[in-house]
């Protein structure tokens, strides 16, 4: 899994039936210091993540399976909304803090 920040939504009214009901988000991956990387991805979201939230993103075959719904044509799936990230030097992220 990777840390990412939600930058926005992607709307696609015409898509494969396997993606019906799956919200699509534009996410930017984060490094170990919480800084944005130059990598972006469109990820499916079934957990209800919102703009600017930090999320956990599963990629590859793990992204294609969720709750026994079979394979979905996804390379990335938001599988969790992050509340806090703590490292040896202290708090890296706290959802309650402003400015993130």
From Swiss-Prot:
Matching CDD domains: EutN_CcmL (cd01614)
Similarity comment text for this entry: Belongs to the CcmL/EutN family. CcmL subfamily.
Subunit architecture: Homopentamer. Interacts with full-length CcmM.
Function recorded in the entry: Probably forms vertices in the carboxysome, a polyhedral inclusion where RuBisCO (ribulose bisphosphate carboxylase, rbcL-rbcS) is sequestered. Has been modeled to induce curvature upon insertion into an otherwise flat hexagonal molecular layer of CcmK subunits.
Domain BMV residues, every copy: 1-83
GO MF annotations, alphabetized: structural constituent of carboxysome shell
Domain notes: The tight homopentamer forms a pore with an opening of about 5 Angstroms in diameter which opens into a wider tunnel at the base of the truncated pyramid. The pore is positively charged.
Family matches, as HAMAP family: CcmL
Any single Pfam family the record assigns to this protein: EutN_CcmL
Cell compartments where the protein resides: Carboxysome
Cystines in this chain: none
Origin species: Synechocystis sp. (strain ATCC 27184 / PCC 6803 / Kazusa)
GO cellular component labels: carboxysome
Coiled coil: none
Keywords on record: Bacterial microcompartment, Carbon dioxide fixation, Carboxysome, Photosynthesis
Protein name: Carboxysome shell vertex protein CcmL
